[in-house]
């Protein structure tokens, strides 16, 4: 189970507070697919709590999902203190049409404000 919230019809937030597995990734992708049906383009806020592990194969699978749905993302705000995840997200900024910003947990309010604009 993931924690989720919405700022508006086109803005969805996800908080990940436990290690990511295939089931959780599938749940996130299902949520995003349902949001795509409601709004042609969405802003996505993802907060990854400290200590959460995300296996590399699942990061790649998620990148493939986002690339397949590239035109459906307007902004991605990623909040994490994990350097490895931050670097992967910086790479996404180069390959996706969406604006991708990475924030530290201390700047999570700034991330929420940015994604809601």
Residue ranges and their predicted role:
Residues 1-117:
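Amphipathic, Lys/Arg-enriched alpha-helical "gate/interface" segment within cytosolic domains
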């Amino acid at each position: 189970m993931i924690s989720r919230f919405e700022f508006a019809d086109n803005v969805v937030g996800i908080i990940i507070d436990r290690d990511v597995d295939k089931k959780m990734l599938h749940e996130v992708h299902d949520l995003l697919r349902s949001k795509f049906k409601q709004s042609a383009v969405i802003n996505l806020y993802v907060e990854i709590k400290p200590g959460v592990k995300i296996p590399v194969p699942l990061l790649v699978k998620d990148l493939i999902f986002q690339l397949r749905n590239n035109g459906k993302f307007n902004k991605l705000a990623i909040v994490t203190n994990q350097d490895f995840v931050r670097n992967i997200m910086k790479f996404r900024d180069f390959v996706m049409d969406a604006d991708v910003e990475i924030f530290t947990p201390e700047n999570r309010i700034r991330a929420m404000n940015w994604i809601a604009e």
